[in-house]
């Protein structure tokens, strides 16, 4: 039996229900105690329930939310949202299909043109339920987590870079965008034919701008003779940091010009980002490279992750 929750007081057993849910995005980080996962999940659910723009559906053993995304809506030019599926051990295909069907029906009725989601690549039941309701494969990312000590590469192999690595300034904005336009041609936003021209560029532009303004995090650049050779942006993950003093910093965009990739520029940038993040209280650092971005994966292999998890990204367009 499905039930839409519109008031937090209507979910009487919310705390006990949350304890059986497997889908906390950070549950695979063992250093976070169980109460951190619990508090994070409850805050996330509370936000979905209390906003009139969102949907919160609960079944016997699972929860599904649809959260309006201002960021995606502004970039896409149409109403967009993020679907989250929270499963317990007792998940079933039939129940999952019904849950996603009801959620997408609500999204269509409320004029959501675009929905996206991420799901553990091992969750076959959830993936099939999404595909049965017109979600299409978009990408696979590998979430790698390491600590400060593991993130600093003491021995860097390659052609030693002589570039200057520094914090980016607002004057670098145009140069960074020029690099990103040359490099990011394989992102899921570029590859999805349903997106209009320029959508991926607007997404990347917004990420870079917020990093330069330090609204979300920070950005480092590699410079030589007044020309930029690469950049690296990172953001504080405020969702989980609100519940733990062990702060998590998430890598976002990084790129090095093709003719300079044999050098150590990317690893020099990584070192700078990790050291700076650590000075700001960061303990855990998370990378989310695409599973087929082999160049980044090869570089990250020099920094063995503490934890690794594969996630599938799926997109759904209305009437597709």
PLM regions with names:
Residues 1-25, 164-187:
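A short beta-loop-alpha structural element at the N-terminal edge
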Residues 92-100, 222, 262-273, 277:
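Glycine-rich acyl-CoA binding loop
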Residues 89-163, 167-171, 287, 293-297, ...:
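Acyl-donor-binding surface of acyltransferase catalytic domains
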Residues 43-108, 112-122, 229-258, 307:
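Conserved donor-binding loop and adjoining core beta-sheet/short helix segment
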Residues 216, 221, 233:
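Phosphate-binding active sites in nucleotide-utilizing proteins
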Residues 188-196:
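A short gly/proline-enriched turn/hairpin at secondary-structure junctions
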Residues 21-56, 197-218:
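Active-site rim helix/loop that mediates acceptor-substrate recognition in acyltransferases
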């Amino acid at each position: 039996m499905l039930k839409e929750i519109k008031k937090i007081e209507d979910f009487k057993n919310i705390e006990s229900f949350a304890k059986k849910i497997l889908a906390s995005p950070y549950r695979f980080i063992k250093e976070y105690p169980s109460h951190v996962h619990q508090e994070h999940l409850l805050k996330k659910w509370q936000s979905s329930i209390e906003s009139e723009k969102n949907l919160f559906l609960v079944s016997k053993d699972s929860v599904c939310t649809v959260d309006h995304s201002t960021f995606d809506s502004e970039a896409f030019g149409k109403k967009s949202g993020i679907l989250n599926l929270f499963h317990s051990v007792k998940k079933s295909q039939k129940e999952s299909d019904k849950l996603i069907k009801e959620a997408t029906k609500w999204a269509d009725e409320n004029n959501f043109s675009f929905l996206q989601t991420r799901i553990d690549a091992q969750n076959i039941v959830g993936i099939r339920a999404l595909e049965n309701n017109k979600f299409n494969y978009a990408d696979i990312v590998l979430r790698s987590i390491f600590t400060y000590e593991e993130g600093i590469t003491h021995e860097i192999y390659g052609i030693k870079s002589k570039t200057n690595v520094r914090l980016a300034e607002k004057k670098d904005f145009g140069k960074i965008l020029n690099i990103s336009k040359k490099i990011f041609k394989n992102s899921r936003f570029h590859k999805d034919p349903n997106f209009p021209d320029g959508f991926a560029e607007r997404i990347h532009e917004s990420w870079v701008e917020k990093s330069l303004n330090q609204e979300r995090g920070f950005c480092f650049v590699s410079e030589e003779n007044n020309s930029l050779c690469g950049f690296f942006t990172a953001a504080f993950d405020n969702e989980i940091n609100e519940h733990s003093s062990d702060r998590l910093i998430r890598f976002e965009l990084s790129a090095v010009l093709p003719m300079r990739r044999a050098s150590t520029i990317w690893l020099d940038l990584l070192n700078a980002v990790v050291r700076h993040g650590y000075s700001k209280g960061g303990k855990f650092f998370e990378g989310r490279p695409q599973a087929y971005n082999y160049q980044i994966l090869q570089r990250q292999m020099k920094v063995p992750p503490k934890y690794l998890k594969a996630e599938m990204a799926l997109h759904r367009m209305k009437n597709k």
